[in-house]
């Protein structure tokens, strides 16, 4: 965007080793098939997000897989002092519980990556999370030793994200979102962002969107004055979902959101129902017609027939989007959603996804 030519590095070799940064225990090694799958998935995701013209993708297997042990020790090992390596935070924090030679040498491999990209591609700046500082500086030192102290080589680290409550933002802290729609659907992705805390939302607008400073300041003011409208959260969810899943993914996510909120779910497809109610309470039922009271009790949506009758009569029960107030009503599993599901809503938005067997 600013005239620079970014290079995205895929860890075809380092992914098979495992980075010890930020970990208290040894990583479990992945199989060759898992590493290959991750390489392909990451490459496809980057192309989808950024296109194919504005950046370059490199895989460190291009050079590291050709490096034999003797050359590794002679050409690079001699340039690293063990006492300096031990003093790196990532290693020092692991010494008490132990660290394998494999993970101990990871920083050398990442240093070689920076050296090759600097020498062959002219890459001058490496960007990574704050836990990568030691690995990045190891690369800068290696470049200066091999190419001279005047060789331009720089590192920039980005602080690991923390939520307002102090917990980490990421998969290790739970509740992570993925770029792959097979792992996090567009609806789940949209919901993740729209449910962000008022204390975090402005920060995320700055991190994850391309909105102007004026637009973000306006949304910050709205959040302060009218937090119940959640204008900033809605804009954040729209911008990030559109960037990752495209206009079609955003529209689908909003359609599912609106349908579940209003209760008008008739027009949702089976796939959209599965997206929207993936994390809702679930139950199973047979494919035969059944009295609504018996159906509610058999699926454990209601604790008793008395409670079921009361809720039905009071208009608290909806079957596939329709309010049913007759205790004589029969639930027909084949009537909607291709006979795969019956959707029960109790009250305003308490959904249960009943799978038909």
Cite the ranges covered by each PLM segment:
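N-terminal catalytic cores of NTP/NDP-binding nucleotidyl/phosphoryl-transfer enzymes
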Residues: 1-19, 126-133
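Gly/lys/ser-thr-rich phosphate-binding loops in alpha/beta enzymes
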Residues: 1-8, 14, 44, 158-161, ...
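Short connector loops/turns at beta-strand edges and beta->alpha or beta->beta junctions
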Residues: 11-15, 111-114, 163, 182
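Short acidic, glycine/serine/threonine-rich loops at helix termini
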Residues: 18-22, 67-73, 167-170
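A charged helix-plus-loop insertion that forms the helical arch/lid used to bind
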Residues: 20-36
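Short, hinge-like loop/turn segments at secondary-structure boundaries
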Residues: 24-28, 74-77, 173
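Divalent-metal (Mg2+/Mn2+/Ca2+)-assisted nucleotide/phosphate chemistry catalytic cores
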Residues: 31-32, 38-39, 43, 47-163
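Conserved nucleotide- and phosphate/pyrophosphate-binding catalytic cores
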Residues: 143, 147-357
């Amino acid at each position: 965007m600013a005239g620079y030519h970014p290079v995205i590095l895929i860890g075809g070799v380092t992914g098979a080793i495992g980075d010890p940064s930020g970990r208290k225990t040894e990583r479990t090694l992945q199989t060759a098939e898992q590493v290959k799958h991750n390489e392909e998935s990451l490459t496809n995701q980057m192309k989808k997000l950024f296109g194919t013209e504005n950046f370059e993708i490199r895989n460190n297997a291009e050079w590291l897989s050709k490096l034999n042990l003797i050359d590794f020790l002679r050409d690079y090992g001699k340039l690293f002092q063990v006492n300096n390596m031990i003093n790196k935070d990532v290693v020092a924090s692991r010494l008490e519980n132990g660290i394998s030679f494999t993970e101990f040498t990871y920083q050398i491999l990442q240093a070689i990556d920076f050296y090759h990209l600097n020498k062959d591609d002219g890459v001058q700046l490496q960007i990574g999370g704050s836990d990568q500082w030691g690995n990045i500086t190891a690369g800068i030192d290696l470049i200066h030793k091999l190419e001279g102290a005047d060789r331009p080589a720089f590192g920039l680290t980005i602080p690991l994200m923390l939520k307002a409550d102090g917990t980490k933002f990421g998969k290790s802290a739970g509740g992570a979102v993925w770029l792959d729609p097979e792992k996090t659907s567009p609806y789940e992705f949209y919901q993740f962002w729209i449910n962000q805390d008022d204390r975090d939302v402005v920060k995320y607008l700055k991190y994850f969107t391309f909105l102007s400073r004026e637009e973000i300041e306006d949304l910050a003011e709205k959040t302060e004055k009218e937090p119940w409208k959640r204008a900033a959260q809605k804009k954040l969810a729209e911008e990030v979902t559109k960037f990752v899943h495209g206009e079609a993914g955003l529209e689908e996510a909003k359609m599912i959101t609106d349908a579940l909120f209003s209760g008008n779910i008739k027009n949702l497809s089976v796939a959209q129902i599965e997206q929207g109610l993936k994390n809702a309470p679930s139950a199973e039922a047979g494919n035969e017609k059944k009295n609504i009271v018996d159906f509610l009790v058999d699926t454990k949506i209601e604790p008793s027939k008395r409670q079921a009758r009361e809720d039905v009569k009071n208009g608290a029960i909806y079957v596939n989007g329709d309010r049913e107030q007759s205790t004589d009503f029969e639930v027909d599993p084949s009537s909607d959603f291709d006979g795969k599901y019956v959707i029960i809503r109790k009250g305003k938005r308490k959904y249960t996804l009943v799978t038909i067997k």
